[in-house]
Design a protein with these regions (language model features):
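Charge-dense, helix-prone N-terminal extensions
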Residues: 2-167
Length: 167
């Protein structure tokens, strides 16, 4: 009987982890939510304006219309990836989100010239694939444009898509 309870408990634990992984996966899927309504809901006016500026910048670079990826990521375009581990999925080619008081721009972790560009950006912090910017007024806006363009080039090189004729 005790073994049965442990087995059931272990099975429930595995089911919970699978459910959490599934829910986590669903958060990064495109949604039907309007990007403009998402941005309009940002309480701080300067952050709303910064988000609109990033939409214009990324639209110009990607030549794609924005769409919501999950509840908070504004993404442009998409690509399919598959890791050596076998894990695969879809992601936005270019994306940003408001995280608290900062804009987070998502870029590839390593591409030629990334560190040089980040040094020219202005006031920011970085994570592995994130660039945290408190205010766009504190950065040279030509740099995020170049960062996004180079990140997209690197992504397309690393994950060629079958429908892009080798691009």
């Amino acid at each position: 009987m005790l073994i049965g309870r442990r087995s059931r408990s272990a099975a429930l634990g595995v089911e919970k982890k699978l459910l959490e992984a599934h829910v986590s996966e669903l958060k990064t899927k495109p949604t039907e939510v309007s990007v403009e309504s998402h941005i309009a809901a940002i309480a701080n006016e300067e952050q709303r304006n910064d988000a609109r500026t990033l939409v214009a910048l990324m639209r110009r670079v990607t030549k794609q219309e924005p769409m919501m990826w999950g509840p908070s990521i504004v993404g442009f375009g998409s690509y399919h990836y598959k890791y050596a581990s076998g894990h695969e999925g879809d992601s936005a080619l270019a994306a940003f989100a408001m995280r608290g008081s900062e804009l987070v721009v998502y870029i590839e972790a390593s591409f030629e010239g990334r560190d040089v560009l980040l040094a020219k950006l202005g006031k920011h912090k970085t994570g592995k694939v994130c660039v945290y910017i408190r205010r766009l007024a504190n950065v040279d806006l030509t740099v995020p444009e170049t960062l996004v363009a180079r990140s997209i080039e690197d992504t397309k090189r690393r994950y060629p898509q079958p429908n892009e004729n080798g691009a």
